[in-house]
């Protein structure tokens, strides 16, 4: 049986965005703080609401390569290298109506951006 009273491990969660088009640099100081922490770390970008999803679906209907957050690059590029190096997991709903498209775009960002460390 697991004893929750003696559990000492902490989990750190930071929020880099709270709505579509939120500040693109908000995650940078969070990641800087996370770099020195040796516990599980998660960086969240919450950018989706009902209206945002409806707009994303319209984009995807018109072009099946679209439908994910048009801001994905702006949020991810400034912190991707440090997140990879310091094992900070990124959680987001930037995939909107096209999560596979967002994953492909993220892969392209990762391949095209020079990084010091890849996991």
Predicted region positions:
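Structural motif
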Residues: 10-14, 40-44, 88-91
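N-terminal amphipathic/basic leader segments beginning at the initiator methionine
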Residues: 2-31
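Short acidic, glycine/serine/threonine-rich loops at helix termini
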Residues: 25-27, 53-58, 101-106
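Class I S-adenosyl-L-methionine
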Residues: 64-76
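Gly-rich Lys/Arg/Thr-decorated short loops/hinges at beta-loop-alpha junctions or inter-strand turns
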Residues: 5-12, 50-66, 83-86
